[in-house]
UniProtKB/Swiss-Prot annotation:
Membrane-spanning segments: 3-23
Subunit structure: Interacts with FtsZ via their C-terminal domains.
Name listed for the protein in its UniProt record: Cell division protein ZipA
InterPro entries named in the record: Cell_div_ZipA, ZipA_FtsZ-bd_C, ZipA_FtsZ-bd_C_sf
Parts of the chain on the Cytoplasmic side: 24-336
GO cellular component, one term: plasma membrane
Keywords: Cell cycle, Cell division, Cell inner membrane, Cell membrane, Membrane, Transmembrane, Transmembrane helix
Polar residues bias spans: 59-70
Cell location: Cell inner membrane
Function: Essential cell division protein that stabilizes the FtsZ protofilaments by cross-linking them and that serves as a cytoplasmic membrane anchor for the Z ring. Also required for the recruitment to the septal ring of downstream cell division proteins.
Length: 336
């Protein structure tokens, strides 16, 4: 009888241990599979300090802009401008009745041109020769002023020569029916051309830019980025970035907008995409675009919002601020 009681007690203890172990194992597996990791993450806030922009190498107009800058640099060469001014001054000719034009041309070529320093007047060999250069007797050096640039000095000399020609024509020393007035007008046009060359062209902002950034302290994985872009109709192509063509699936159709990596150099290396991660993406559209700009912008905005939702990021405007209704109206005003 005592053995039966002892057996029942041991069986009950064994059953209790098995039940306890089963409950503990089930709870541990449940916590491992269904653990809520969002409670341990920091608050999701957009990245405030973003200094990245569209890489210059990805802009199709970068080559043209670089070529334009080289052209401006060559145009601003002081030596070249000085030579052009001297050539313009040598073209100023005043022919008097009865004077040999060849002898007068040789005198003009022998006459020195101002190069920033005053020169002594040349003694005339003929009584009828006209001194068209400015007399420097009244020029006093101003030591308190800063030295002028070669462009300013050459322009000043040209203005003095033009004023001297006009004064002599008004006094009757030069035949007013000759081609002197025409050459004076030529000198004025040369000065206007030099002043226009000094002006820098203002580049217009002809590109719409939107950003998709990850929450603070997080990054987008490369395989997720590529999968999301392909699902939205992007195709990997030129410049090693993704493009959205006018006709989805047809890479021969024109590109409407593109997406690049926000981090330099801005490309997507598909051979190393499993090790790739980024803090954000930049979507840009050149204006004017192929087709209707308003329709293309709405497609760009909708695609950007879907991409941000798929990756769990935020949409920012070109000023790296949260894209709101005011930003939407501002962008629509630019494409309208």
């Amino acid at each position: 009888m005592e053995l039966h009681i002892l057996f029942f007690i041991l069986a009950g203890l064994l059953i209790a241990v098995l039940i306890s172990f089963s409950l503990w194992s089930a709870r541990r597996e449940k916590s491992r599979i269904f653990s809520n990791t969002f409670s341990t993450r920091p608050p999701s806030t957009p990245i405030n300090n973003i200094v990245s922009d569209v890489p210059p190498s990805l802009n199709p107009q970068s080559y043209a802009q670089t070529t334009g800058q080289h052209g401006e640099t060559e145009a601003d060469n002081p030596v070249q401008i000085q030579q052009e001014v001297e050539s313009s001054l040598r073209e100023i000719k005043i022919n008097l009745p009865g004077q040999d034009s060849a002898a007068y041309q040789s005198k003009v070529e022998e006459t020195p041109i101002y190069s920033g320093q005053p020169v002594l007047p040349v003694q005339p060999q003929y009584q009828t020769q006209v001194q068209y250069q400015t007399q420097p007797q009244h020029i006093e050096p101003a030591f308190t002023q800063a030295p002028q640039s070669p462009i300013a000095e050459a322009t000043s000399v040209l203005e003095q020569s033009v004023e001297e020609l006009e004064r002599q024509a008004a006094q009757g020393d030069v035949d007013i029916y000759s081609d002197a007035s025409v050459r004076v007008e030529l000198a004025k046009n040369s000065m206007q051309a030099d002043s226009v060359a000094e002006q820098k062209p203002v580049a217009e902002n002809n590109m719409l830019t939107l950003y998709v950034v990850a929450p603070e302290g997080q990054q987008f994985r490369g395989d997720y980025v590529v999968q999301s872009l392909e699902a939205l109709g992007f195709q990997y192509g030129e410049y090693q970035i993704f493009h959205r063509h006018q006709h989805m699936g047809n890479s021969a159709s024109p590109v409407i907008f593109s997406v690049a990596n926000m981090m330099q150099p801005g490309i997507f290396d598909l051979t190393k995409i499993e090790h790739f991660s980024t803090v954000g993406l930049v979507l840009f559209m050149h204006l004017p675009s192929e087709g209707n700009d308003v329709v293309n912008f709405k497609l760009l905005l909708k695609t950007t919002e879907n991409l941000a939702q798929a990756l769990g990021g935020f949409v920012l405007n070109e000023h790296r601020e949260i894209f709101d209704e005011n930003s939407r109206q501002s962008y629509l005003a630019r494409v309208s």
